[in-house]
Amino acid sequence: MSKKIVIIGSGFSALSAACYLAKAGNDVTIYEKNSTIGGRARQLKKEGFVFDIGPTWYWMPDVFERFFADFDKKPSDYYELIKLSPAYQVYFGHLDFVTIADNLPEIVATFESIEKGSGKQLEQFMAEAKSNYDIAIKDLVYRPGESPLELITLETAKKVNQFFSNIKKDVRKRFKNMKLVQILEFPVLFLGAKPSDTPSFYSFMNFADFGLGTWHPKNGMYSVILAMETLAIELGVKIETNANVEKIDVTNGKATGILV
């Protein structure tokens, strides 16, 4: 049975949820308090310049591909994606930087040039990171997140020891040069946690970095927001901007309406 559904906010999660709910046959309306959509991924236009004011890294392109595929679409139907080469540079001071290539063999060579033996160590580290990535995408990322028990699968059980160690410990066991250590520890910051608090299993973020590469949508990350907006509208979602939700009416523990 079709339901009338209200979504407050218009960031990535809101637009994604709106698309899936509309596809399921629901009457969906997004209410956004700002004049433009995007949430933390909004865009700033000023004095002839355009800025992404939120995310600037496009990693894990397979996740975006899967999202659009759920609606028989492709990212390329909406925006052009460019793989950055080199991927990025990490600065440690004035004219003191390490360039990260767009492919693993070159990155391995870069590591080896900085610390003897680190190339082989990186290959081993990345093999484990890829294994973790495959498990994360298959068994974890798309779970609803309702219970810690969702983390327990046959595959994750085989990796149980990695949930009792952390990224900082694993990286520093393999690498001594602090530049290499910092390069390998920083990806988990995108998860909102420190390397010392992040289980070793989350090295899959390193595979997202070195294995899948860093990408950039032409015209900026806001292109992805516009793509999701277009898809949502195609699915019948209504989007109201300058619509601040002042109150959620609740009756018998259930939301029954909103005050805008």
Task: Set out the residue ranges of the language-model regions.
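Rossmann-like flavin
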Residues: G93-P199
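N-terminal glycine-rich phosphate/pyrophosphate-binding loop and immediately adjacent elements
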Residues: K3-S131
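A broad, structural surface signal
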Residues: C19-K23, K33, A109, A127-D134, ...
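Active-site-adjacent bridging/hinge elements
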Residues: Y31-N34, P199-S203
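Helical element adjacent to the flavin cofactor pocket in flavoenzyme catalytic cores
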Residues: F204-A255
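Generic recognition of stable, solvent-exposed alpha-helical segments in well-folded globular domains
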Residues: S10, S16, V63, E106, ...
